[in-house]
Amino acid sequence: MFAGLPSLTHEQQQKAVERIQELMAQGMSSGQAIALVAEELRANHSGELIVARFEDEDE
């Protein structure tokens, strides 16, 4: 599977981590927090995208 992912600076990555931690502190599961922050990043990102390939099967 290929996915277009936002290319983030270190500062943007750090803010995303802090946002995930904040949501988890409020009682959200880690999976939900990551999914929400990823959705927010995709919705608000205006920079470059990188292409990443994810393997669904174990080798």
From Swiss-Prot:
Which protein is depicted? UPF0181 protein YoaH
| Superkingdom as given in the UniProt entry | Bacteria
UniProt-listed InterPro entries: UPF0181
Q: What is the lineage of its organism?
A: Bacteria, Pseudomonadati, Pseudomonadota, Gammaproteobacteria, Enterobacterales
Under HAMAP family, the record lists: UPF0181 (MF_00507)
| Protein family membership | Belongs to the UPF0181 family.
